[in-house]
């Protein structure tokens, strides 16, 4: 028996046949070899592949595809030339309609892990994009040199090798163009480029952001020090070659770190901010401001949150994890009052500014945690009808879930970017709430990410 058990264990470098059962949460194929779970990036459900083990972990193994014996009918040729090296997308080799089906399945699996019935009949089809390309409004590409040429891209996974990305197929065309213009000018002016291995040089990263609705573009150079040689010439060239660039910024980050931004940001030319609109709302975006990366699908996501809240105009709403106030402001016209909180004081300052600029008088924003503010407000006689949560990937704080169960608003609208933490939190809320439906939304086509809006109603 012991001998048999030993035989069934995989070893690094071993090749073996495997049938792919489903997609994992990171977009990898999941199969079983002699009852051991194996994660295989690039393999698709229903495929029969020959895989080679690359890593053994406790309870699972990782492998790579050596050969596809039987391909999925949904397998397509990834249009991006650096798709397999870059790692930014995980699902370009899967037909887009099937990506939407598989993302729903990822959500179903997450709920099955925490609940027996998995709520499958309540999980709706994923809302996708008509055109799932060139949707991202912001890029952060590292800068390097290759044979005297300036290149921009991302580091190959677990290496110092920079993959040259001349044209990213999920980036907005204007962000691609701005990056191309800037790298061309840096090369022409022979500006010093940071060398990651030697940790020497000046320009580290080019960050570009496009306001999709207004067409304004912002370029931020991340440098190791403040002095920028040929600064005036650089500015003049950028403005001449791409008039859409309305804001040229510089950020200084001298630390040996993979964190992009340093502490000091200042304007080189143009405006400090660019203007963007979402529906009827407009936002000022500074170099470091958080803003949703896919504005088109953000409108879809927020409209789903609005539908789930089912507002009549009389509701008091709490917007927990409110950030710069976007979801709350999206609902404010149809609510009696919106109160939001966030642990980041700068975000609260922006939320107040955004509310004021739009003329809202029924909003209130406080720095701190929802689990601190909510009991205080209830004590003062202010009780919410709807609580909207849009937490980070780790999900809601346990104390917030306990507070929601104590305060018992009529409805909870849960906006999530991580199906695993969503399913865990929803299970906790089901002590007092019933799930009416789960609506997956595809915010990032060709990646494994899936957002969800869940409507929970008090029992």
From Swiss-Prot:
Top-level enzyme category: transferase
InterPro entries: MeTrfase_TrmA_AS (IPR030390), MeTrfase_TrmA_CS (IPR030391), NA-bd_OB-fold (IPR012340), SAM-dependent_MTases_sf (IPR029063), TRAM_dom (IPR002792), U5_MeTrfase_fam (IPR010280)
Presence of keyword S-adenosyl-L-methionine: yes
Alphabetized UniProt keyword annotations: 4Fe-4S, Iron, Iron-sulfur, Metal-binding, Methyltransferase, S-adenosyl-L-methionine, Transferase
Domain TRAM residues, every copy: 9-67
Superkingdom, natural source: Bacteria
Keyword match Transferase: yes
Residues where [4Fe-4S] cluster binds: 80, 86, 89, 168
Binding site for S-adenosyl-L-methionine: 292, 321, 342, 390
Pfam families the UniProt entry points to: TRAM, tRNA_U5-meth_tr
UniProt EC number: 2.1.1.-
Membrane-spanning ranges: none
Gene Ontology molecular functions: 4 iron, 4 sulfur cluster binding; metal ion binding; rRNA (uridine-C5-)-methyltransferase activity
Swiss-Prot/TrEMBL GO biological process terms: rRNA base methylation
Catalytic residues (positions): 417 (nucleophile)
Family statement: Belongs to the class I-like SAM-binding methyltransferase superfamily. RNA M5U methyltransferase family.
NCBIfam families: rumA
Protein's UniProt name: Uncharacterized RNA methyltransferase BCE_0542
């Amino acid at each position: 028996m012991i001998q048999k058990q030993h035989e069934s264990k995989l070893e690094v470098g071993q090749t073996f046949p495997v049938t792919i059962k489903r997609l994992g949460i990171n977009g990898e194929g999941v199969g079983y070899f002699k009852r051991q779970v194996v994660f295989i990036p690039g393999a698709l459900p229903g495929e029969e592949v020959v895989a080679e083990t690359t890593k053994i972990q406790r309870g699972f193994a990782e492998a790579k595809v050596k050969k596809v014996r039987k391909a999925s009918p949904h397998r397509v040729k990834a249009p991006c030339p650096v798709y397999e090296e870059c790692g930014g997308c995980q699902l370009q080799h899967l037909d887009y309609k099937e990506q939407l089906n598989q993302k729903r399945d990822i959500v179903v699996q997450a709920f099955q892990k925490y609940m027996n019935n998995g709520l499958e009949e309540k999980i709706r089809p994923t809302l996708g994009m008509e055109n799932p390309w060139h949707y991202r409004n912001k890029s952060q590409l590292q800068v390097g040199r290759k044979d005297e040429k300036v290149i921009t891209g991302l580091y190959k996974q677990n290496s110092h090798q920079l993959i040259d990305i001349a044209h990213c197929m999920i980036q907005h065309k204007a962000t691609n163009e701005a990056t191309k213009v800037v790298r061309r000018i840096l090369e022409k002016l022979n500006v010093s480029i940071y060398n990651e291995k030697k940790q020497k040089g000046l320009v580290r990263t080019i960050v570009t952001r496009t306001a999709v609705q207004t067409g304004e573009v912002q370029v931020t150079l991340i440098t190791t020090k403040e002095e920028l040689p040929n600064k005036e010439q650089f500015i003049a060239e950028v403005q001449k070659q791409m008039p859409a660039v309305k804001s040229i910024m510089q950020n200084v980050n001298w630390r040996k770190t993979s964190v992009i931004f340093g502490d000091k940001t200042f304007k080189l030319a143009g405006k400090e901010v660019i203007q963007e609109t979402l529906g009827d709302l407009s936002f000022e975006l500074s170099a470091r401001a958080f803003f949703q990366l896919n504005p088109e699908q953000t409108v879809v996501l927020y409209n789903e949150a609005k539908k789930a809240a089912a507002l009549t105009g009389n509701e008091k709403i709490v917007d927990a994890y409110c950030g710069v106030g976007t979801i709350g402001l999206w609902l404010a016209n149809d609510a009696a009052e919106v109160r939001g909180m966030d642990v980041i004081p700068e975000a609260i300052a922006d939320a107040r500014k955004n509310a004021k600029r739009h003329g809202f008088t029924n909003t209130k924003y406080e720095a701190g945690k929802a689990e601190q503010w909510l009991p205080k407000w209830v004590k003062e006689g202010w009780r919410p009808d709807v609580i909207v949560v849009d937490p980070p990937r780790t999900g809601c704080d346990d104390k917030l879930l306990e507070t929601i169960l104590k305060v018992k608003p009529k409805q909870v609208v849960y906006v999530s970017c991580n199906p695993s933490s969503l399913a865990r939190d929803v299970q906790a809320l089901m002590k007092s709430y019933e799930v009416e439906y789960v609506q997956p939304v595809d915010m990032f086509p060709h990646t494994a990410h899936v957002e969800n809006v869940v409507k929970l109603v008090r029992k």
